[in-house]
């Protein structure tokens, strides 16, 4: 079982994944854009990292940036969620 997973998604999908990881005893890592900083749902994650960029293609679809954050956070896996990375 993984001990720490980066969730490469946002909104309801990301929260559901984070909640499931918590029930499994796995630490969750969330990603957010500058616009999303005030959203309360990020409190559901064990760690949160900011994505650089303005558009979806510069943030949630930037695979290199997401993998860089995963390495920085010592994530053992990346969950793509629904849409975004799961479609690429």
Predicted regions and their residues:
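ATP-binding N-terminal substructure of ATP-dependent carboxylate-amine bond-forming enzymes
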Residues: 1-88
């Amino acid at each position: 079982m993984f001990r720490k997973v980066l969730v490469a998604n946002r909104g309801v999908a990301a929260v559901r994944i984070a909640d499931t990881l918590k029930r499994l005893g796995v630490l969750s890592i969330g990603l957010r854009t500058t616009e999303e900083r005030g959203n309360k749902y990020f409190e559901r994650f064990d760690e949160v990292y900011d994505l650089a960029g303005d558009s979806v293609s510069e943030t949630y679809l930037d695979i290199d940036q997401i993998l860089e954050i995963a390495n920085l956070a010592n994530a053992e896996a990346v969950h793509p969620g629904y849409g975004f990375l799961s479609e690429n």
